Amino acid sequence: MCALVPSFFTNFGWPSTNQYESYYGAGDNLNNGTFLELTVPQTYEVTHHQNSLGVSVSSEGNEIDNNPVVVKKLNHNASERDRRKKINTLFSSLRSCLPASDQSKKLSIPETVSKSLKYIPELQQQVKRLIQKKEEILVRVSGQRDFELYDKQQPKAVASYLSTVSATRLGDNEVMVQVSSSKIHNFSISNVLGGIEEDGFVLVDVSSSRSQGERLFYTLHLQVENMDDYKINCEELSERMLYLYEKCENSFN
């Protein structure tokens, strides 16, 4: 009787030093016994960890993709990394615009901003000074060019210089004519007066003066003998006087 009852403490599936037959009666099947094989699986710890997280190995990637909270957090982290990278690039570019003495130092972002704010007004003053210097140089260059151009054209201008004539009406039958001429030209006022007398004008008075340069000035006071035959036109008279002067000049050349 005692041989058929198993001991109180079993081996719980661990190999026993005794024969299995000592615990079973004749004709009993070993597979139908009352004792269970309690072997510990090798993946117990992994399975336990997965079960505690509620995610299986095969579906872990799908669960992350389908979890909006996790996806949102990952996207936020990626955006934050990109934002910081762009900010660092911008501040690096700003730092490169500072003077060389400041670029050699490892400046923090606040220091970079502070030095940039101080450096901007200095650059603005430098730009103003450079613009002013440029304008001064342009004025000097332009003046030099004008002088050279005038110097080249001066002989030709003197050779072809003409007198100027202006007429001013004083009354119904009186007019004052002013003539300006160069002294280097051969000019005879008597020849001009002879021409205008033929046109019906009478000389009342004449005066002349000289300037410090090569200029002669004549002032003629003329009257018209017959107002019925001639109406004073100052513009036409000026052109007539200039024509007579040029005619006299050519006759002397």
Swiss-Prot record:
GO biological process: one example: regulation of DNA-templated transcription
| Entry keyword set | DNA-binding, Nucleus, Transcription, Transcription regulation
Answer whether the UniProt record assigns the keyword Transcription to this protein.
Answer: yes
| Upregulation | Induced by OBP3, auxin and salicylic acid (SA). Repressed by jasmonic acid (JA), UV LIGHT, and heat treatments. Up regulated by iron deficiency in roots and leaves, as well as by nickel, high zinc or high copper treatments. Repressed by high iron, low copper and low zinc treatments.
GO MF terms, alphabetically ordered: DNA binding; DNA-binding transcription factor activity; protein dimerization activity
Any single Pfam family the record assigns to this protein: HLH
Q: Which CDD domains would you find in this protein's record?
A: bHLH_AtORG2_like
**What protein does this entry describe?**
Transcription factor ORG2
Any keyword Membrane? Answer: no
Q: In which tissues is it expressed?
A: Roots.
In what residue span(s) does the bHLH domain sit?
71-123
Where it mainly occurs, coarsely classed, is: nucleus
Q: Where in the cell is it found?
A: Nucleus
GO (cellular component) term, any one: nucleus
